[in-house]
């Protein structure tokens, strides 16, 4: 079984928003999120709830829970079995914040424009 490769979206200024988010997590939350990223890398587009959920416009969320802390990293699939991590947030409400999804869609469109 071929694995997928995970890459971080990089803005024109060189920032990697999902990586910044990951580094800001507590040690335990980061470790659990990295474990979930490895599962995503192995399963790719076959990964489903409770680990991953399709949101809209080609954007998915990786769902990680550590105690009462719930984090999400948004991502999309790209050619050559690539998973592009766009941004992340700590979940504080039942619904995924619309602005987080809109940001992920903007990053996705920018990535596609620059790499196709």
Where are these regions (language model features)?
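Conserved Hanks-type protein kinase catalytic core
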Residues: 76
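Portal/gating segments that form or line small-molecule/metal binding sites
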Residues: 73
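Compact, Lys/Arg-rich rRNA/RNP-binding cores from ribosome-related proteins
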Residues: 89
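Conserved catalytic cores of phosphodiester-cleaving nucleases, focusing on short active-site segments
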Residues: 86
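Basic, Lys/Arg-enriched alpha-helical interface segments
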Residues: 1-70, 79-83, 92-116
């Amino acid at each position: 079984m071929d694995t997928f490769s995970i890459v971080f979206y990089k803005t024109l200024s060189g920032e990697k928003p999902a990586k910044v988010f990951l580094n800001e997590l507590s040690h335990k939350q980061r470790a659990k999120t990295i474990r979930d990223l490895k599962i995503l890398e192995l399963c790719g587009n076959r990964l489903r709830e409770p680990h991953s959920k399709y949101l809209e416009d080609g954007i998915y969320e990786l769902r990680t829970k550590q105690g009462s802390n719930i984090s999400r990293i948004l991502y999309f699939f790209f050619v050559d079995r690539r998973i592009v991590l766009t941004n992340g947030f700590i979940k504080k409400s039942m619904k995924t914040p619309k602005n987080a999804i809109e940001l992920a869609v903007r990053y996705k469109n920018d990535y596609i424009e620059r790499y196709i």
